[in-house]
Amino acid sequence: ALAWGNEYMSQLTDAGVPAAIVAKKIKFNFGISSNYFLEIAKFRAARLLWANIVASYNPECLRDCDNKGANGECRCAAKMAVHAETSTFNLTLFDAHVNLLRTQTEAMSAALGGVDSMTVTPFDKTYETPDEFSERLARNQQLLLKEESHFDKVIDPAAGSYYIENLTISIAQQAWNLFLSVEEAGGFYVALKAGTVQAAVNESNKARHKAVAQRREVL
């Protein structure tokens, strides 16, 4: 995702579009897995790394923005816009209302990770077209986090947690190394044309299905 975003930044800034405008127009879409703490750390790491990538383009504040950093860069441009969607990988056909617990936990981890918006998958999506009831529940799941748990009132609520902070750093380091390897190979577009990206995704998907089949991973 970072390499993809950087490809847009590189192509458009080379075409003469100001870096601040490009960065503010890019929005990332992420899936949310059932690994609660890992997902919180994942979103935190993504925001950290994207801010570093954007900063390398030295984005200048536009006329309607005066949020400048220490070196005069536009800090608004470095903010990562993130939309997240709960997974369908772990949803069950049997006792389907248990899916509400799964999607709620995933939505909670995304909210704590700092996403801007999210889509909660209706609990019955795996076996039928969601009806009005299941769609209303899906909408209300995230509203409960906002209106009753007040998750939108605290900036980075996971900050200071020893476990999550260390997990964030670990994910950021691994993601950054992967990002650098893609860039050294010519960038995301080159990797996409060569089929490297698709091959990596397919291999990861195959490994996960195998882990579930061998009961080494719990859904």
Named regions from a protein language model:
Residues 1-77, 81-109, 122-139:
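Helix-rich catalytic cores of soluble enzyme domains
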Residues 19, 61, 116-117, 152, ...:
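Residue-level detector of short coil/turn "hinge" positions at structural boundaries
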Residues 23-27, 77-81, 115-117, 176-179, ...:
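Active-site lining segments that contact anionic ligands and/or coordinate catalytic metals
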Residues 110-111, 144:
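Histidine kinase transmitter module recognition
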Residues 114-125, 151-157:
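Short acidic/histidine-rich active-site segments
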Residues 136-219:
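Catalytic-core signal marking the mid-to-C-terminal active-site face
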